[in-house]
Regions:
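A short, exposed loop/beta-hairpin motif centered on an aromatic-Gly-Thr core
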Residues: 29-40
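Short, charged, surface-exposed hinge/linker loops at domain edges
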Residues: 1-11, 39-77
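Short aromatic-glycine-(Arg/Gly/Cys) micro-motifs in beta-strand/loop hairpins
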Residues: 14-28
């Protein structure tokens, strides 16, 4: 029987003023990262999540992550 994993939501939002992607999560206390590259930011979160969860006393082996990205831009006519 497979173990049920808890799914964490990580929000990846483009900050147009700073020209960076920002990662935050209500499920992961302390997670605030930024990067100019979406791929690089996702890679950074993969390493940060287990560390932050361990600091909060949560076993990261029973977790999965759902990344949600959002970027708003004006339409160029």
């Amino acid at each position: 029987m497979s173990e049920i994993k808890m799914e964490l939501i990580v929000n990846l939002i483009w900050d147009n003023e700073a020209a960076v992607w920002v990662a935050t999560s209500e499920d992961i206390p302390g997670l605030v990262l930024e990067s100019g590259s979406l791929d690089a930011l996702m890679e950074r979160t993969r390493y940060a999540i287990p560390e932050l969860m361990a600091l909060n006393g949560i076993d990261s082996n029973k977790l999965s992550v759902c990344y949600r990205s959002e970027r708003h831009e004006p339409v160029i006519a």
